[in-house]
């Protein structure tokens, strides 16, 4: 073991803290030896007797490379003292003491054994990258440590993260700092030409660095497309320099060639994504060219889609990239931005948990037993909006039900992939199309072998893969097809099926995509190439795409875009599949134009109508629910609210005011409209058209709401009519505010009545509207006695002139009341 690594200075402190406590944070810059030296120096600690070290690396390439370095120091190969586990690949033996794993592997191990009984120390390497799985795994490990394994040690290692902040969240865990080893770096700032692409700008600065400096060059570009374009530009110059690409999708042997010195000792250029920022050691690098950009996945809450976004690097990322130039000796870093703008860069990268799609995290939490994420201790808590959207997706995939993981959800976790892809594979297994499902899943997980210019149809990729398997000619990228076949083979092994080498139904891929992305089933939306998805969003195919003539498609890959997404990968879809597999849904609604109930059976994909048929025997309860909603919207004017019903409302309202102790229904219009279920439901069973509302007798309906004892009180205290001296029963006109009801009666019919009539047990006098024989108003009074005495004599004079055939006695108190016309006595 080499003793010139800076990490050696703090190894005693790390050993001491891990012996006395169970959690420690180590801050050490890249190149200090924390990944490749420290684990070996901890193996003899007493708490690791009979236990292993589990070290988490964020990337597969880094996991392999770290394991090889550990093995080399012991004169071994991976699988002996040190081993690794990555997706679809494992090099671990019975004597392995240090296991280097990628993040998804650790999560799976925790789910299989919550207490991690075989392990004494968990190391989180490169934690500053703040990947989603690292945050989740740390939260789960912390809970396992607190509840099941207080003896389990956790070591969090970071190059740039704020150790004090992590310490506080991890229970004030000790922070140990290694100064590292960094040679001086000269910074050269070069203006970015906005008229050129990132690849053009980067290649220009690389050529400048070749002329100005000696040594190998590491250039950072955002994505694999930028790398390929930059490589094409450099290769056209015919440089006597080896040019290597380095990104995650490349074959392992190509990646290793980029890490090692050139066999013939030639100078080399490595064009890399952010994969080379930390754990990987690339021999001979003295010059770094930083494009200033990185490409990161971002989840759009509003669209529900994840898209890759090219963003400016943060200060901590720029510093890490520059640090690669100063590991072996003094170096140079070319930055493609002005020096004055460097301090304006965002200080730190955002944790992935804040911007990622969280369905896999939520499924893991549900399987752990904590769908409520707040019950775990997080370095950065996941956003509630993203959690809600993930829960909704998992419910659509039948992975969650009523907040619990389902049998289907547990089956999804058996596949080391996103829940959508796992659901696709399960669908293929259930429908006996596992081989094609394996191919579709592999194509979705790997890079596109044809490129976007070939169009969006995934069947073209399936054909290319089939041709490649049959050793037939294909224009597709053979390296990508090889990787795709490797992944497909892993899925076929797990599903126990053979490879697909023959053509399949054109819509089969669409069925599989629809299973994984049910909300992205899409129907052409009036304009060729424009599709409306089941979730209501809109996406477009590129002009001249082979799928343009398809009415229905299922979309696997698209960019969220600003208003309309761009479709990158899709397949034709037969919507009758949904009719065959689903029972459809009964829909009952009110047709405003025709004023009638419409009942149909519909088959839908989300918001998209596939087909519908008339429903012969609709559910009456559902009809009543729709009608009640119509009443809420349209109001009481739907009904024939005649005077008799109106007066009942006013009588009840008045009595409620006069006697609040009497329990009576609330018949105010606002209350009736707000809660039609309470009074209208029993009478709506036969209503189908707007005219049917007018046929309902509101007086009878309202009367039925009043219990018999209260009805008796209503008739007694607030009668509908009262008798007058003539023997007539005269209706009262009640007011909803409880004021005096009006008794509109001809004057002659109350001759002989000395005082104003009353109701409500004599407590409420009526308001008399005294009328002429022609029912014209003569006088309004609430004091009949005063009227007879003071006003009647004058009124009599006028009435005798106007109504000469009628009798108008001088003494109204003793006069006989008259119903009809009575001949006037000459003296009267």
Labelled PLM ranges:
Residues 1-424, 559, 737, 748:
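P-loop NTPase motor module signature
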Residues 233, 239-240, 245, 257, ...:
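Second RecA-like catalytic domain
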Residues 183, 539, 729-731:
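Short, isolated positions in well-ordered beta-strands
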Residues 534, 597-599, 604-828:
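Charged, non-catalytic accessory extensions
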Residues 123-124, 249-255, 427-449, 744-770:
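Charge-dense polyanion-binding interfaces
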Residues 323, 554-574, 744-767:
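Short, solvent-exposed cationic patches
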Residues 171, 524-527, 715-718:
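A short, compositionally biased
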């Amino acid at each position: 073991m080499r003793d010139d690594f800076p990490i050696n200075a703090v190894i005693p402190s790390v050993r001491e803290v891990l012996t006395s406590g169970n959690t420690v944070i180590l801050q050490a810059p890249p190149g200090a030896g924390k990944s490749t030296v420290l684990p070996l120096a901890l193996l003899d600690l007493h708490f690791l007797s009979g236990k292993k070290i589990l070290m988490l690396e964020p990337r597969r390439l880094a996991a392999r490379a770290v394991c090889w370095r550990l093995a080399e120091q012991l004169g071994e190969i991976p699988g002996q003292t040190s081993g690794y586990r990555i997706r679809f690949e494992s090099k671990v033996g019975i004597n392995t003491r240090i296991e280097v794993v990628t993040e998804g592997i650790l999560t799976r191990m925790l789910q299989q054994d919550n207490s991690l009984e075989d392990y004494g120390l968990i190391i989180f390497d490169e934690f500053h990258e703040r990947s989603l799985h690292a945050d989740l795994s740390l939260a789960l490990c912390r809970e396992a440590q607190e509840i099941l394994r207080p003896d389990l040690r956790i070591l969090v290692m970071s190059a740039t993260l704020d150790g004090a902040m992590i310490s506080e969240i991890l229970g004030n865990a000790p922070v140990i700092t290694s100064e590292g080893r960094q040679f001086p770096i000269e910074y050269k700032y070069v203006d970015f030409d906005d008229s050129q692409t990132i690849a053009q700008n980067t290649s220009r600065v690389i050529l400048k660095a070749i002329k100005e400096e000696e040594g190998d060059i590491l250039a950072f570009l955002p994505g694999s497309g930028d790398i390929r374009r930059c490589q094409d530009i450099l290769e056209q110059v015919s440089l006597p320099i080896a040019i290597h690409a380095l990104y995650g999708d490349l074959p392992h042997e190509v990646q290793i060639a980029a890490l090692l010195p050139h066999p013939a000792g030639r100078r080399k250029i490595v064009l890399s994504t952010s994969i080379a920022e930390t754990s990987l050691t690339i021999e001979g690098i003295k010059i770094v060219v930083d494009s200033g950009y990185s490409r990161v996945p971002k989840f759009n809450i509003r669209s529900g889609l994840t898209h890759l976004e090219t963003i400016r690097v943060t200060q901590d990322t720029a510093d890490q990239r520059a640090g690669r130039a100063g590991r072996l000796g003094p170096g140079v870093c070319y930055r493609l931005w002005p020096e004055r703008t460097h301090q304006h860069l965002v200080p730190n990268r955002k944790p992935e948990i804040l911007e990622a799609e969280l369905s896999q995290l939520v499924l893991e939490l549900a399987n752990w037993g904590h769908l409520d994420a707040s019950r775990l201790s997080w370095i950065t808590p996941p956003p509630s909006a993203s959690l809600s959207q993930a829960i909704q997706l998992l419910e659509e995939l039948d992975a969650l039900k009523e907040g619990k993981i389902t049998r289907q959800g547990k089956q999804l976790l058996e596949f080391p992939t996103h829940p959508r892809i796992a659901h696709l594979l399960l669908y293929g297994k259930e429908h006996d199309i596992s081989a094609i499902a394996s191919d579709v899943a592999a194509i979705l997980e790997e890079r596109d072998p044809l490129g976007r210019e070939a169009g969006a149809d995934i069947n073209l990729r399936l054909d290319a893969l089939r041709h490649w398997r049959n050793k037939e000619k294909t224009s597709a990228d053979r390296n990508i097809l090889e990787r795709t076949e490797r992944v497909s083979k892993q899925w076929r092994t797990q599903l126990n099926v053979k490879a697909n080498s023959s053509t399949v139904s054109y819509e089969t891929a669409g069925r599989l995509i629809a299973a994984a992305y049910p909300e992205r089933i899409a129907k052409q939306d009036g304009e060729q190439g424009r599709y409306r998805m089941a979730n209501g969003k809109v996406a477009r195919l590129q002009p001249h795409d082979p799928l343009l003539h398809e009415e229905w498609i299922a979309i696997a890959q698209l960019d969220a875009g600003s208003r309309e997404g761009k479709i990158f990968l899709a397949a034709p879809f037969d919507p009758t599949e949904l009719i065959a597999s689903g029972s459809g849904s009964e829909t009952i609604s009110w047709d405003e134009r025709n004023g009638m109930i419409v009942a149909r059976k519909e088959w839908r994909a989300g918001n998209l109508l596939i087909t519908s048929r008339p429903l012969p025997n609709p559910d009456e309860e559902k009809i009543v629910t729709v009608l009640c909603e119509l009443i809420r919207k349209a109001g009481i004017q739907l009904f024939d609210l005649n005077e008799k019903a109106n007066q009942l409302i006013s009588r009840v309202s008045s009595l409620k005011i006069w006697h609040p102790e009497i329990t009576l229904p609330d018949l105010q219009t606002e209350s009736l409209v707000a809660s039609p279920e309470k009074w209208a439901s029993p009478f709506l069973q036969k209503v189908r058209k707007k005219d049917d509302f007018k046929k309902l007798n509101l007086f009878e309906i309202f009367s039925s709401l009043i219990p018999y004892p209260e009805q008796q009180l209503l008739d007694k205290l607030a009668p509908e009519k009262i008798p007058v001296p003539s023997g007539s029963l005269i209706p009262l006109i009640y007011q909803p505010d409880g004021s005096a009801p009006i008794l509109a009666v001809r004057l002659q019919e109350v001759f002989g009545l000395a005082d104003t009539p009353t109701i409500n047990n004599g407590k409420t006098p009526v308001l008399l509207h005294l009328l002429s024989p022609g029912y014209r108003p003569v006088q309004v009074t609430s004091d009949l006695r005063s009227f007879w005495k003071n006003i009647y004599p004058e009124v009599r004079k006028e009435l005798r002139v106007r109504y000469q055939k009628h009798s108008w006695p001088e003494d109204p108190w003793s006069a006989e009341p008259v119903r009809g016309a009575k001949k006037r006595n000459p003296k009267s």
